[in-house]
């Protein structure tokens, strides 16, 4: 996560040892966009842990047989104070938002949306929109923005080639 604070506070990170153990968070199935929608495996938030650092949501979807499930069809909805990254492994999704962005994301690409003081967006990866679409597979991670920028400017960025 980018730290956009002008004067960030220094802090000491505790050193973990093997004695500290490892917490395994099991994902749960959640319908994305309603009860008859595509299912995602949501790891965060969970009953035992709502955050890991700045990460507040972690969803994995697919591989999903789009013809059987209808694919991803998330109607317009608002976000504030967070940033989302969508990384697609298989299929196509169309992102639309109130900033005027309309961007198709393909495998290996990223969409980065900064909600700031508020943005409304939708995501669609259906056979209706992409008739040749067979499967959909990807992840979406959300981070809580730092207090200094949480109500700042909104933005959308598409990364067509992710450096490896």
Q: What is each model feature region?
A:
Residues 115-148:
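Ligand-binding loop in jelly-roll beta-barrel domains
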Residues 2-43:
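Hydrophobic alpha-helical membrane-insertion signals
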Residues 31-89, 138:
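A short glycine-rich, His/Asp/Glu-containing loop-to-beta-strand
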Residues 78-93, 112, 142-147:
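Short, conserved beta-strand element in jelly-roll/cupin
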Residues 72-74, 99-101, 124-131:
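Catalytic micro-motifs at enzyme active sites that drive phosphoryl/nucleotidyl and oxygen chemistry
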Residues 137, 144-164:
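Conserved, well-structured core segments that form or line functional sites
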Residues 44-46, 126-132, 163-164:
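A generic local secondary-structure boundary/capping motif
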């Amino acid at each position: 996560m980018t730290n956009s604070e002008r004067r960030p506070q220094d802090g000491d990170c505790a050193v973990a040892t093997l004695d500290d153990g490892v917490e395994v968070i099991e994902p749960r199935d959640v319908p994305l966009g309603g009860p008859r929608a595509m299912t995602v495996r949501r790891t965060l938030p969970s009953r035992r842990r709502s955050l890991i650092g700045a990460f507040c949501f972690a969803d994995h979807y697919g591989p999903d047989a789009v013809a059987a499930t209808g694919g991803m069809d998330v109607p317009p909805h608002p976000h504030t104070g967070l940033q989302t990254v969508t990384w697609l492994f298989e299929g196509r999704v169309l992102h639309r938002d109130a900033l005027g962005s309309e961007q198709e994301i393909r495998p290996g690409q990223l969409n980065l949306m900064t909600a700031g003081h508020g943005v409304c967006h939708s995501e669609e990866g259906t056979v209706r929109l992409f008739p040749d679409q067979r499967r959909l597979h990807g992840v979406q991670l959300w981070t809580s923005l730092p207090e200094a920028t949480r109500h700042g400017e909104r933005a959308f960025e598409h990364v067509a080639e992710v450096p490896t």
